[in-house]
């Protein structure tokens, strides 16, 4: 009795090693008029939002925004106040994708955030944003799916 395995081929994507890019961004922001002056900054917190990614000619372009929330003690009243502001994030990883990669997943995080007061109405924000791009290339997966002449040889599939 000679049996042969039937192989089936499936289209899939193969994940390649991730590409990590860290970018530092700094900007000055004016405290909105509706907020009281800053006496002392208590804490700043940031969250990265990746909005889009484009893949073309071996490069990945990522765009998004960094949402920063600042908690501070107001001048005069001494009470805690907060306000949020948004910083744009644009990054291009040029020439680092293997040829044939047509898809990629992008994730990111804020690895460091520093907010300090330059004066009671102006703050300096310095943020390090880490982007991780995992490229995917089209691939084929071959797996055994059945046995030839199963019925003739009395083979049962469970």
Where are these regions (language model features)?
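Viral structural modules
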Residues: 1-158
């Amino acid at each position: 009795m000679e049996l042969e395995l039937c192989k089936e081929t499936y289209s899939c994507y193969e994940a390649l090693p991730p590409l990590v890019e860290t970018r530092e961004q700094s900007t000055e922001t004016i405290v909105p008029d509706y907020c009281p002056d800053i006496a002392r900054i208590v804490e700043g917190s940031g969250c990265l939002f990746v909005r889009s990614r484009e893949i073309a000619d071996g490069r990945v372009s990522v765009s998004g925004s960094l949402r920063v929330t600042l908690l501070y003690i107001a001048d005069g009243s001494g009470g805690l106040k907060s306000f949020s502001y948004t910083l744009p994030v644009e990054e291009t990883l040029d020439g680092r994708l293997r040829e044939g990669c047509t898809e990629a997943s992008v994730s990111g995080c804020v690895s460091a955030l520093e907010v300090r007061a330059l004066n009671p109405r102006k703050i300096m924000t310095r943020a390090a944003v880490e982007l991780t791009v995992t490229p995917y290339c089209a691939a084929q997966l071959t797996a055994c799916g059945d046995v030839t002449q199963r019925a003739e040889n009395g083979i049962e599939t469970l």
